[in-house]
Amino acid sequence: MFKKFSKEDIHTRTKVKTSVQRSLKSKLVEQFPKLEEVIDELLPKKTELQIIKCSDKIQLYAVGDEVLFFQKFEELIPTLRFVHKYPEAFPTIQIDRGAIKFVLSGANIMCPGLTSSGAALPEAPGLAQDSIVVVNAENKENALAIGKLLMSTEDIKSINKGHGVETIHHLGDCLWNFSLV
Amino acid sequence: MLKKVVYCGVCSLPPEYCEFTGKIRRCKVWLHEHDQELFAQLYGDDKEDVDGVAARLGQSSIGEEREEQLEKKLQKLQAREESKEQRELARKLSSRVVIRREARTKRKCMVVVAGLEVFEIDMKKLAKTFASKFATGCSVSKNVEKKEEVVVQGDIADEVEAYIHALLEEKGMKGVKVEQIDAAKKKKKTPTTTTPPPS
């Protein structure tokens, strides 16, 4: 999604009304319930949230010059810098060491990379298809990508073939290197 | 409550992922300078060994054969990345900045700064600073070769040159040539040659 992305893709940049900001916050908490305890720390009431509309109907939400989360369709997707601050709040999957290289260059994650001994998937009942997951790596502390499940985690375990996760945002991509100033 | 993650100053990733960017040598030096604790944690305690393979990073379960393959590929990537950097640096050092003074109407002239695009300088921002610094109009325009250049109104070539020198030095590009060309006739000198000396 952010293979090619630069300042030229920005259309408008406006302040978000506080009422909208409130509803955004509650939506975030709804999506990631564990965020509730820290949401006020991440997004204090007085901060000025900005919405940045970009091409391809992507919307970024930023505080100051840091993009915190973005939206393509319905769901809000946190950026990696946001995830790094409070990783516990997000559903996480783990890939093995062999896959890191490919994910960092933007590839989708294949099922075997999620089921081998170095990888980890949440226990049953697992996560449903299309949910947003944070991708962590073996022996690493911080997340390296944000993705969307192309099949449910149970399916990944049983089928174990083909694309498992679509990589949306990864370390070192254009959104990661993107700065508003 | 919130975690604070250190990001590598060279490749901007969390330091544990530096090995995958192919810039690990410079990343290690940076980390050693900035966060000794994390450095020891990631790369072990041998502080001098910058080239060595990161032993602790390598713990994994993907089997020796695949690990070896991965290592090879990473080394290749590193070599490629390094040669790319060197090429880039050479290109930067061999290129030059041209400051041209051009005539407008009558006694007015403007200064055109070309050749900055190699140095990753934000032209628009530079134009803005010029405009406020010298209190003139300043803009970015495209020249005949479709390359961007900064156009400053007013006869301030020397001041602009001094500023650009400082800017390049800040970026660690001190050896870059900055050349000044005068495309406009200097009006002050012409009368002394044409008019006969009073006698």
UniProtKB/Swiss-Prot annotation, chain A:
GO terms under biological process: formation of translation preinitiation complex; nuclear-transcribed mRNA catabolic process, nonsense-mediated decay; ribosome biogenesis
UniProt keyword terms in alphabetical order: Cytoplasm, Protein biosynthesis, RNA-binding
GO cellular component, one term: cytosol
InterPro entries: MCT-1/Tma20, Pre-PUA, PUA, PUA-like_sf, Uncharacterised_CHP00451
Major place of residence: cytoplasm
Protein's cellular compartments: Cytoplasm
CDD domains on file: MCT1_N, PUA_MCTS-1-like
SMART domains, per database record: PUA (SM00359)
GO molecular function: RNA binding
Domain PUA: 90-172
Pfam families reported for this sequence: Pre-PUA, PUA
PANTHER family associated with the record: MALIGNANT T-CELL-AMPLIFIED SEQUENCE 1, MCT-1 PROTEIN
Protein family: Belongs to the TMA20 family.
UniProt subunit comment: Associates with ribosomal complexes.
General function of this protein: Involved in translation.
Name assigned to this protein: Translation machinery-associated protein 20
Source species: Eremothecium gossypii (strain ATCC 10895 / CBS 109.51 / FGSC 9923 / NRRL Y-1056) (Yeast)
Organism taxonomic ancestry: Eukaryota, Fungi, Dikarya, Ascomycota, Saccharomycotina
Curated annotation (Swiss-Prot), chain B:
UniProt keyword terms in alphabetical order: Cytoplasm, Ribonucleoprotein, Ribosomal protein
Gene Ontology terms: biological process: formation of translation preinitiation complex; nuclear-transcribed mRNA catabolic process, nonsense-mediated decay; ribosome disassembly; translation reinitiation
InterPro entries associated with the record: DENR/SUI1_TIF, DENR_C, DENR_eukaryotes, DENR_N, SUI1, SUI1_dom_sf
Matching CDD domains: DENR_C
Any matching Pfam family: DENR_N
A Gene Ontology molecular function term of the record: translation initiation factor activity
Subcellular location(s) per record: Cytoplasm
Superkingdom of origin: Eukaryota
Quaternary context: Interacts with the 40S ribosomal subunit.
Family label: Belongs to the DENR family.
Name of the protein in its database record: Translation machinery-associated protein 22
Source organism per UniProt: Eremothecium gossypii (strain ATCC 10895 / CBS 109.51 / FGSC 9923 / NRRL Y-1056) (Yeast)
